Amino acid sequence: MKLTKLLTYLTTEPSVNDSQDPEITSIEMDSREVKKGSLFVCVKGYTVDGHDFAQKAVENGAAAIVAEREVDVNVPVIIVRQSLRALSVLSDAFYGQPTKKLQLIGITGTNGKTSTTHMVDEILKKAGKRTGLIGTMYMKIGDETLPVKNTTPESVTLQKTFKKMNDKHVDTAIMEVSSHALSLGRVHGCDYDIAVFTNLTQDHLDYHKTMDEYRHAKSLLFSQLGGAFNHEHPKRAVLNADDEASAYFEKVTAAHISTYGIKNDADVMAKNISITAQGTSFDLVTNKGTKHITMSLVGQFNVYNVLAAVATCIAAGIPFEIITEAVEELHGVRGRFELVNQQQEFPVIVDYAHTPDSLENVLETCRDMTEGKLFVVVGCGGDRDKTKRPKMAKIAVELADEPIFTSDNPRSEDPRAILRDMEAGVENAYYHSIANREQAIFFAIANAKKGDVVLIAGKGHETYQQIGNETFDFDDAEVAARAIVELNKNKTNS
């Protein structure tokens, strides 16, 4: 695509004449990825500034530069106010506006995004849809699975992925949309058909600073939803009727609204809920029909996830009978209330719960399964929201019998300093503090007995631990399995 053609998608009036109109071969934000004919977009990040690498990009073959300030290079420079938003718009245009050729479903919220995204994907596949998925754990294009770095990838990667979905004849894409991606404008060029809200509780205040700012970031998915009206395929917002933030989102969107919930009246509801260690049953009540549901997933939080998925699929036009059949066949997502089974006498559960609300929810579910003592291994991430550390410790102490504080991903912080922040919220309480996460997991499992439950919280599906500037292999489920094997071996030898 010619540079001048590409720049017509920006609202600015770039001064590029016909003699400066190269053919653009790719769009890049990393100078190391630049090749002959690339358009390099200078983005100022947390640790490096792309403007400092403009000359390097030109040396690597960049045909033009997009920047927020003048840079001294011998190729055309287009000045914009916000490079990241320009990057989103340009990427969308360069790849042929691929989301306009998909039914695009965006799911946002503090907790439940990953599970709900996978549930929607499973239901749509049951209905015969060819799906794509973009989420915390991986990206999927039809049957192909690809790794990811962020919950919501950078806009260039995002639009390139959507273009691949077009090429692979994907008709519906489901994606997790993080608050960071919304506030940074990564999804600015995405044409969503359905936007879904799970819940809003404390998280990411290291970035958003206040809950109002965090809520505003989430609201951008809904305020942008009505931007491209189509009477044949109206935009739809799916909101949690039991979360007070939904009232705010309802005000900012022009889309048709569907609701789901347990406590308050909604379009999709669960009634007569029964939860056991073996699974959950409830009456699914919708304007499309009522059905008694029995599923293997455990916990009220999973009921909410299912309701969100059902409401989403109804909004997507999937028949109610197919939806209910698929719901009863749903299986858990790795690292989300994942049972580790090595023939031990007590349940060991790995869960991604890393916010106060999600930890409280999963501990309450575990308590219902516990005849003896409830153990929880929990830590808090370094270089992240410090205000939730004492809150999570307090929840662990109040809801578990054997709380064990440990490291999560300490990153650049001293693990013991993080533990001290946690301990500040539970002075004079009973708890264990073991900085080494592997040792903490082994300690919990070695001390658990029949009738007890061990919850390992915080990292879920992650297969690494970040300590300082290094990243080490670390998988909670794998470590737990080794601890159980050692426990069983010791019992056999004793």
UniProtKB/Swiss-Prot annotation:
Presence of keyword Ribosomal protein: no
InterPro entries for the chain: Mur-like_cat_sf, Mur_ligase_C, Mur_ligase_C_dom_sf, Mur_ligase_cen, Mur_ligase_N, MurE/MurF_N, UDP-N-AcMur-Glu-dNH2Pim_ligase
UniProt: meso-2,6-diaminopimelate binding residues: R384, D408, N409, P410, R411, G458, E462
The EC number(s) this enzyme carries: 6.3.2.13
Annotated UDP-N-acetyl-alpha-D-muramoyl-L-alanyl-D-glutamate binding sites: S31, N150, T151, T152, S178, R186
Residues annotated with N6-carboxylysine modification: K218
Keyword Cytoplasm: yes
Locus of motif Meso-diaminopimelate recognition motif: 408-411
Any single biological process term in GO: regulation of cell shape
Any Pfam family the entry gives: Mur_ligase_C
Transmembrane regions listed in the UniProt entry: none
Post-translational modification comment from the UniProt entry: Carboxylation is probably crucial for Mg(2+) binding and, consequently, for the gamma-phosphate positioning of ATP.
Chief localisation class: cytoplasm
Compartments where located: Cytoplasm
Gene Ontology CC annotations of this record: cytoplasm
Binding site for ATP: G109, T110, N111, G112, K113, T114, S115
Essential cofactor(s): Mg(2+)
Family that this chain belongs to: Belongs to the MurCDEF family. MurE subfamily.
Function (record text): Catalyzes the addition of meso-diaminopimelic acid to the nucleotide precursor UDP-N-acetylmuramoyl-L-alanyl-D-glutamate (UMAG) in the biosynthesis of bacterial cell-wall peptidoglycan.
Protein name according to UniProt: UDP-N-acetylmuramoyl-L-alanyl-D-glutamate--2,6-diaminopimelate ligase
Native organism: Bacillus subtilis (strain 168)
Originating gene: murE
